[in-house]
């Protein structure tokens, strides 16, 4: 640490870039602290110095009003280099906005990331106030105990008991004291997350009231008042869990719109009841049947009636308009979908659906929405995977019930709680790992308007207006499920135009953007979804979907097609029809030549010419036009870039890291340069923190670069643009620098010095220091000639262990370095090496 030369200084630093987007205060704060000054985070009465540059006008006015010394960043640097307290009047701060009208408010938005500091009562005032307020409230409650009012409590078995107030208050205060003590020790946040609240409810026996079954009759559930009251008192008032209360109030609002659905209310209450029960994960086989006892007979018949009808595209388009409004109105999508009795449950946990944006499933969705739909469809398979693992077999009626229960349980949990860890891990599984999940089966008999709306809410509308392959649910079920369901001859078959099985549902989204995407690596197969040229007669054919890996390998492997660049021949896995009739050809015949670099930068491995024409998202044809349109925006972005990269480079040498950080920030702000580690052909400026003769300085001299001090950067930062270099050139320490720079400026072509042009051929020893390559480069840049073998040279530079000749001069490396520094050939007699 430097000497405390500024020990009496209390500084307030406000250093911004001229456009107000970059804050450079931290670097100068560090330098001031190293010199012994105190740096205040706020402008208080103890501040004696304000380091100011492009700061707030209010700071400037306050400093002038109080008579505080306003200095520039140059004062800090001068004090550091001189090692003494420099007079502040030599470096006054400048306020460029002083003469601007006061009505103009300059907005400042720092684009630099903030440092994360863990909040404690010591470093956070709001946290400290909250902590003190909580302690005062505890003290007030201790002094104002009312011992006269008894308390009535409900035990977990439903019995009513009498408890004196003293016991309740004492236990309550002891819990608060314990909580405060833990907070003091751990310094944790005062507001626990909902996952912490859930853990407390399991550990604390006083919260066991949540586990009490809500024995409310079915008739009572029909009224909204009883539903809201029972739900509120059980979860919000008794438990004191504000998180649960918020969820119930949301549910209460949604139930007001569906008064006629008795089963929905019962399902909600049962899901809430099971939510607090720790034994839910160990459900026996009889629980789904008991759960379904509340379903009406019509809805159970609706589950069992699996008809062969399909929902037409017109119905999908009509429902696509009202689908997003329906989801917005009824937030209870997991429960609603389960009460309708359909086996195509497209549900997610409530906590997950809140954090992930809903996407509309219309066929006119832009590409961004299609990418979101791809992720959401894969996530929707998760409940079915958990169901298959827990039960081990598929039950015809109990499937929706179990899924509804699992969704009901997780809909009130915190998304980041440990209970949902398994769920979130399962979302990342590739599609083929989810094949054992139960296939989505559906009934499409004549439905009412409300039932159709419920189905449309859960359906995928991405394939409206497209002809897709059909799936034999029976064959697929027989291969993936150990105990398949019993279906009739005509009932087991259904087209997948509306809803497909779980694996295909995850894979169908690959074709949404008008092209095929290869499946994850290692699968060895890919699905072909869209058939734009499929003949009309294939609409009614039911093609079995074979799930074996060997048959899937017959489909196109798109990744190998892209890498090899050969024509892909895709065969239909069931009918063996030719590619030219059904599938778009991905390999294009392009007349325009493209370089290897352009091909590598094209998206997805495609290459081709680019034409001016609109991008098409609906169909692919056999020409390369579709891919040209996809490639075009990427190439335009590549050509335009985010501003062209500067052609000249700047090199730093003999500079500590803190100075380097300042230089990098200033260069990034003022533009015009790019930072290079070593001097090269494009280098024009060499910044030297100390006047030391380094290789970069010598190379900069030999190439005719500016050799400047660090102050040039500081003054440029002060004035907001790159200023003239001449006052900051280190010509006193390196007299050759301005001479070589002038020669370089006057030279017509590429500059090459003439210092060693009259010298004989030289040989640089491999044992020389600096390294051979750098020393040879220096000699070559100064006009010298370097030989690779010593017998052709008349001058040998560096230590030489071979046989020495009398006619050859053996000189030290310093001869080359001193000659370049002084810009004259030094006398060789002073640099001879001992024979």
Swiss-Prot record:
Q: List, as start-end ranges, the regions of compositional bias called Basic residues.
A: 343-361
Q: Which residues carry this modification: Phosphoserine?
A: 279, 287, 296, 333, 548
* Domain BRCT residues, every copy: 1-93, 640-730, 751-833
Q: Which UniProt keywords apply?
A: Cytoplasm, Cytoskeleton, Phosphoprotein, Repeat
Annotated CDD domains: BRCT_microcephalin_rpt1, BRCT_microcephalin_rpt2, BRCT_microcephalin_rpt3
Bias (Polar residues) ranges? 559-577
Q: Which InterPro entries does the annotation name? A: BRCT_dom, BRCT_dom_sf, Microcephalin-like, Microcephalin_mammal
Q: Give GO terms for biological process.
A: cerebral cortex development; mitotic cell cycle
The record ties this protein, via Gene3D superfamilies, to: BRCT domain
Q: Report the locations given in the UniProt record.
A: Cytoplasm, Cytoskeleton, Microtubule organizing center, Centrosome
- Phosphothreonine: residues bearing it: 335
Pfam name, any one: PTCB-BRCT
Q: Give the start-end ranges of region Disordered.
A: 332-376, 417-442, 555-583
GO CC term, one of those recorded: centrosome
Q: Which PANTHER family match?
A: MICROCEPHALIN (PTHR14625:SF3)
Q: How does it assemble?
A: Interacts with CDC27 and maybe other components of the APC/C complex. Interacts with histone variant H2AX under DNA damage conditions.
| Function according to Swiss-Prot or TrEMBL | Implicated in chromosome condensation and DNA damage induced cellular responses. May play a role in neurogenesis and regulation of the size of the cerebral cortex.
Domain description? BRCT domain 1 is required to prevent abnormal chromosome condensation. It binds directly to the SWI-SNF chromatin remodeling complex. BRCT domains 2 and 3 recognize phosphoserine/phosphothreonine marks on proteins with high selectivity, and mediate interaction with phosphorylated CDC27. They also mediate the dual recognition of phosphoserine and phosphotyrosine in the C-terminal tail of histone H2AX.
Q: What is this protein called?
A: Microcephalin
Origin species, per record, is Pan troglodytes
């Amino acid at each position: 640490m430097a000497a405390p030369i500024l020990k009496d200084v209390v500084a307030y630093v406000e250093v911004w870039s001229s456009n107000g987007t970059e804050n450079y205060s931290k670097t100068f704060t560090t330098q001031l602290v190293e010199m012994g000054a105190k740096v205040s985070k706020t402008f208080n009465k103890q501040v004696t110095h304000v380091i100011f540059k492009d700061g707030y006008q209010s700071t400037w006015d306050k400093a002038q009003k109080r008579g505080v010394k306003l200095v520039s960043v140059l004062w800090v640097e001068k004090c550091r280099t001189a090692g003494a307290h420099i007079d502040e009047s030599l470096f006054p701060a400048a306020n460029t906005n002083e003469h601007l009208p006061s009505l103009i408010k300059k907005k400042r938005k720092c684009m630099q990331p903030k440092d994360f500091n863990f909040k404690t009562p010591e470093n956070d005032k709001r946290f400290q106030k909250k902590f003190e307020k909580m302690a005062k409230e505890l003290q007030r409650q201790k002094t104002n105990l009312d011992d006269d009012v008894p308390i009535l409590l409900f035990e977990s078995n439903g019995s009513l008991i009498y408890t004196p107030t003293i016991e309740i208050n004492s236990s309550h205060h002891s819990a608060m004291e314990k909580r405060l003590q833990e907070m003091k020790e751990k310094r944790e946040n005062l507001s626990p997350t909902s996952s912490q609240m859930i853990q407390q409810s399991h550990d604390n026996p006083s919260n066991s009231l949540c586990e009490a079954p809500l024995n409310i009759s079915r008739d009572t559930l029909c009224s909204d008042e009883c539903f809201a009251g029972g739900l509120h008192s059980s979860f919000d008032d008794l438990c004191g869990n504000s998180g649960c209360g918020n969820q119930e109030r949301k549910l209460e609002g949604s139930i007001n719109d569906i008064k006629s659905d008795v089963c929905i209310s019962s399902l909600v209450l049962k899901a809430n009841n099971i939510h607090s029960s720790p034994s839910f994960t160990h459900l026996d086989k009889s629980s789904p049947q008991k759960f379904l006892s509340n379903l009406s007979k019509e809805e159970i018949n609706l589950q069992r009636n699996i008809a062969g009808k399909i929902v037409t595209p017109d119905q999908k388009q009509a429902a696509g308009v009202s689908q997003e409004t329906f989801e917005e109105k009824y937030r209870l999508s997991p429960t609603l979908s389960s009460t309708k009795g359909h086996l195509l449950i497209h549900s997610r946990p409530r906590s997950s659906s809140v954090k992930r944006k809903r996407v509309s499933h219309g066929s006119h969705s832009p590409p961004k929405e299609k990418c979101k739909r791809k992720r959401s469809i894969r996530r929707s398979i998760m409940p079915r995977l958990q169901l298959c693992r827990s039960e081990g077999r598929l039950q015809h009626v109990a499937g929706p019930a179990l899924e509804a229960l699992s969704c009901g349980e997780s809909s009130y949990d915190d998304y980041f709680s440990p209970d949902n860890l398994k769920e979130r891990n399962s979302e990342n599984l590739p599609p083929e790992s989810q094949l054992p999940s139960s296939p989505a089966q559906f009934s499409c008999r004549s439905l009412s308007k409300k039932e159709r709306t419920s189905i449309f809410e859960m359906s995928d509308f991405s394939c409206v207006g497209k002809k897709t392959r059909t799936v034999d649910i029976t064959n697929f079920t027989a291969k993936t499920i150990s105990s398949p369901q019993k279906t009739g001859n005509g009932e087991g078959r259904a087209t997948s135009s509306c809803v497909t099985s779980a694996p295909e549902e995850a894979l169908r989204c690959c074709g949404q953007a008008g092209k095929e995407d290869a499946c994850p690596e290692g699968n060895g197969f890919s699905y072909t979804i869209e058939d734009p040229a499929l003949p009309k007669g294939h609409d009614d054919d039911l093609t079995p979907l074979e799930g074996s890996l060997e048959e899937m390998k017959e489909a196109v492997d798109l990744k190998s097609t892209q890498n090899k660049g050969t024509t892909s021949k895709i065969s239909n896995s069931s009918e063996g029809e030719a590619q030219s009739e059904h599938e778009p050809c991905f390999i294009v015949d392009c007349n325009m030549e493209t370089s290897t670099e352009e091909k590598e930068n094209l998206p997805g491995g495609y290459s081709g010419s680019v034409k001016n024409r609109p991008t098409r998202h609906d169909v692919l044809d056999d020409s390369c036009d579709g891919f040209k349109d996809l490639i075009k925006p990427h190439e335009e972005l590549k050509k335009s870039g985010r501003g062209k990269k500067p052609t000249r480079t700047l090199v730093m040498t003999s500079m500590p890291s803190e100075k380097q950080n300042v230089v990098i920030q200033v260069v990034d702000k003022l533009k015009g340069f790019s930072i290079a580690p070593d001097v090269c052909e494009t280098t024009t400026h060499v910044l030297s923190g100390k006047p030391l003769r380094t290789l970069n300085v010598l190379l900069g001299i030999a190439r005719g670069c500016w050799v400047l001090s660090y102050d040039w950067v500081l003054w440029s930062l002060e004035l907001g643009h790159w200023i003239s270099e001449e006052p900051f050139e280190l010509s006193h320490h390196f007299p050759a620098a301005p001479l070589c720079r002038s020669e370089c400026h006057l030279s017509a072509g590429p500059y090459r010095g003439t210092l060693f042009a009259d010298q004989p051929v030289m040989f640089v020893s491999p044992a020389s220091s600096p390294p051979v390559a750098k020393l040879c480069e220096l000699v070559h840049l100064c006009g010298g000639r370097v030989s690779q073998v010593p017998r052709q040279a008349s001058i040998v530079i560096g230590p030489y262990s071979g046989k020495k000749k009398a006619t050859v001069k053996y000189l030290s490396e310093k001869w080359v370095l001193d000659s370049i520094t002084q810009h004259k050939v030094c006398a060789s007699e002073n640099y001879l090496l001992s024979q």
